[in-house]
């Protein structure tokens, strides 16, 4: 009678010990170890809760017995007996030869030159007319604070789940150019298609330039992964595809004397709707490659002052309170709250402040005034921990209580 993985008297962490795998990164759920199959450092993800492993480079995967058995080329029964023997002696298993598994080299991808903004706008605008917004996504946008009219005006649409080729064919027949438009690519048979994945389902957020052209698309994922909620519609890894270019989103009047700078187009759209103010939105606080050109355009159109309104993590209290993320479970300081500084919080605050400093530096070089904008402060002038984004603060000013389901904003 064979035991199931759950009934075995050892865990996958014991196998990691026996094989003497070097752990490069760990948290309460999983470890990233050196792969014994291809030798790549830190690519073998070992899930402690599920008792499984997978190499993100060579693709080797399986359960805890399979990990040991595959390394020593044994059947599962023999592997199980050896595992129990070595664990009983509290000793590691014999040395083994790391098999340098060859990874099939991919063909070099040839990208198309990114199309001009006007072409992007025409193609994306036509694409949006062919798509719909699901009731689920509409409800989420309403819960965030948008009105139905604003949702319609901004052009949010749900990602399609099939018919990518036919959508592309319809666009081409409508006179649209797809070559050089991020998201579109050419398949091996020469047919053009659209790069949507089921694992990246969500709703599309049009990203607009100062001139009002749709120059990119972000996707708000239904199921975020690796702490990622937003991704670009891109085909940079596909034949004749194109990268997003990470453009800066603008909403409002570029001739306003005051413009607010924040992170994320959806946050900017909502903040503009709630306040009536103009917002420029970088894709991420440290994604500033396109920022100088945007600020220069704003300066030429009459902008006198830019307010930095990045998230209030920039004033995050870094004292350890065992409340930050799953890493707190394994932190040695968790039982001594308030006595130590949280390294994770320090890293997060440093990341946000780095983006702030870069914005200040660009504005200084271009001779545009820039000031920090803050809210939700405690008595010590640090973030009180309630209203993280400028959209949260503006929503709160409206006298509404955000729905619990809106914690993912």
Region locations from a protein language model:
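N-terminal structured subdomain of primase-like DNA metabolism proteins
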Residues: 1-104, 160-163, 168
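TOPRIM fold recognition
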Residues: 1-10, 54-59, 256-259, 267-409
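Residue-level preference for well-ordered alpha-helical positions
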Residues: 16, 69, 84, 142-143, ...
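Short, well-structured beta-strand/strand-turn elements
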Residues: 24-25, 144-158, 276-287, 373
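Terminal peptide-recognition signature
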Residues: 35, 55, 68, 141, ...
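Conserved active-site segments centered on acidic
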Residues: 78-136, 140
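Tandem CBS (Cystathionine beta-synthase) repeat/Bateman regulatory domains
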Residues: 131-176
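Phosphate-handling DNA/RNA-contact segment within nucleic-acid enzymes
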Residues: 164-302, 318-320
């Amino acid at each position: 009678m064979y035991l199931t993985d759950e009934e075995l008297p050892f865990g996958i962490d014991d196998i990691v010990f026996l094989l003497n795998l070097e752990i490069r990164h760990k948290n309460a759920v999983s470890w990233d170890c050196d792969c014994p199959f291809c030798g790549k450092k830190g690519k073998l993800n070992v899930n402690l809760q599920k008792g499984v492993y997978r190499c993100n480079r060579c693709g080797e995967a399986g359960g805890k017995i399979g990990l040991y058995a595959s390394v020593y080329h044994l059947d599962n029964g023999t592997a199980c007996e050896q595992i129990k023997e070595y664990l009983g002696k509290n000793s590691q298993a014999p040395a083994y030869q790391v098999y340098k598994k060859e990874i099939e080299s991919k063909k070099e991808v040839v990208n198309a030159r990114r199309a001009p903004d006007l072409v992007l706008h025409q193609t994306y605008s036509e694409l949006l007319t062919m798509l719909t917004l699901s009731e689920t996504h509409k409800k989420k946008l309403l819960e965030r604070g948008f009105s139905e009219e604003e949702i319609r005006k901004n052009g949010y649409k749900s990602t399609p789940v099939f018919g990518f080729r036919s959508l592309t064919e319809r666009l081409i027949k409508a006179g649209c150019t797809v070559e050089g438009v991020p998201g579109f690519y050419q398949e091996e048979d020469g047919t053009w298609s659209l790069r949507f994945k089921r694992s990246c389902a969500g709703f599309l957020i049009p990203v607009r330039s100062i001139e009002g052209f749709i120059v990119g698309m972000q996707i708000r994922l239904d199921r975020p992964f690796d702490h990622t909620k937003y991704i670009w519609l891109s085909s940079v890894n596909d034949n004749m595809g194109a990268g997003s270019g990470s453009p800066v989103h603008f909403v409002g009047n570029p001739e306003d004397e005051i413009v607010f700078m924040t992170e994320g187009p959806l946050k900017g759209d909502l903040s503009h709707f709630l306040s009536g103010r103009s917002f420029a939105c970088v894709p991420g606080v440290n994604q500033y490659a396109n920022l100088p050109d945007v600020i220069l355009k704003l300066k030429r159109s009459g902008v006198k002052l830019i307010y930095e309104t990045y998230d209030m993590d920039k004033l995050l209290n870094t004292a350890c309170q065992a409340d930050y993320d799953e890493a707190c479970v394994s932190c040695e300081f968790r039982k001594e709250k308030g006595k130590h500084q949280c390294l994770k919080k320090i890293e997060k605050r440093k990341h946000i402040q780095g983006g702030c400093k870069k914005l200040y530096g660009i504005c200084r070089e271009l001779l545009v005034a820039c000031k920090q904008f803050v809210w939700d402060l405690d008595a010590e002038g640090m973030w009180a921990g309630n209203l993280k984004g400028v959209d949260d603060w503006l929503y709160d000013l409206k006298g509404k209580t955000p729905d619990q389901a809106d914690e993912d904003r």
